[in-house]
Amino acid sequence: MRIFGYQKDGQELLELREATISCSGLDELDKIIDFLIEVRKEHALEAELMSPMCHSHLRDWDNTWKKGEPDFIIVSEFESLP
């Protein structure tokens, strides 16, 4: 697993050693967990279709997301089959 990020106003992709997600309450943590469960299902379907990779954004999944809020992106890269 590799972790990447951007500075708040930056455009340069940075490879990170670790990342912190600070939740203001269990509701936000539950939202992330629900998002990850849904991503797992969607990415499993993409793997079955033999897609080389897929990605999902929290902003596309969360209908309460507002411009300017942080996004959380999950990328799954699937190994090529012989």
Regions found by a protein language model. Give the residues of each.
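Positively charged, low-complexity terminal tracts
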Residues: 1-82
